């Protein structure tokens, strides 16, 4: 059995199918891990969700900020934004089935056999593996329990509080947990978030650094797979940390990682997220090559 992890899809189905065909993915034997942001901005958000739903028995997903945005818009807790490509999902006859499936996905996945965690954006440097799983479960419970769901979506948006505190309660507590797992790029060594900076690691403001680079990060013995940060172009020099968002929806590429061998495969994408000539490049981890994404990241 092979386990493959793929970076942000954002409604770009063609490159995913190209990659899975390239590695001869067999859903009867292999497993597919997805780092979240399954939908939005790309040309095939509805088709992507339907395709993934059909693969659900062979699939592990964690939720990204765009997936949570979809749930909020569907419940009318948030309005569609310029550039969103979610309307076709909201108007689909099978929307409730698809959205119900999205609600049941995780915020963090941990494979104990491989000692590998997968999240969308990152893990707060001050959290251990045990604490990270515990806090992810708090948000997962809010997503899956009807009596908590609406209040969570109502209070999910916002940049404050910018730092974790064990005494936080209610929706405020859930918001900061969600921001760590689905929006984080830069933070201080004690976890204070900068949610405005979205470019490369060299753009960190004084006192801040990429979440994965802090020397005292409590998950250094853990392998971590993440997406979200398109400006990294699928590259991360931190040992044991694997960045998979290579800017497919911005004309970069979509990246697939064999979780066991660490071999990478990338499908080049055009400016709107379609596969570009079906071209797939293969390389060892850390040697990804793809065009630089030129659009602003979210």
Swiss-Prot record:
EC number: 3.6.1.41
Entry GO MF terms: bis(5'-nucleosyl)-tetraphosphatase (symmetrical) activity
Keywords associated with the record: Hydrolase
Pfam family, one: Metallophos
Class of the enzyme per the UniProt entry, highest EC level: hydrolase
Xref: InterPro entries: ApaH, Calcineurin-like_PHP_ApaH, Metallo-depent_PP-like
Catalytic activity: P(1),P(4)-bis(5'-adenosyl) tetraphosphate + H2O = 2 ADP + 2 H(+)
Hydrolase is among the record's keywords: yes
NCBIfam families: apaH, PRK00166.1
Family label: Belongs to the Ap4A hydrolase family.
Protein name (Swiss-Prot/TrEMBL): Bis(5'-nucleosyl)-tetraphosphatase, symmetrical
Naturally occurring in which organism (per UniProt): Pseudomonas savastanoi pv. phaseolicola (strain 1448A / Race 6) (Pseudomonas syringae pv. phaseolicola (strain 1448A / Race 6))
Gene: apaH
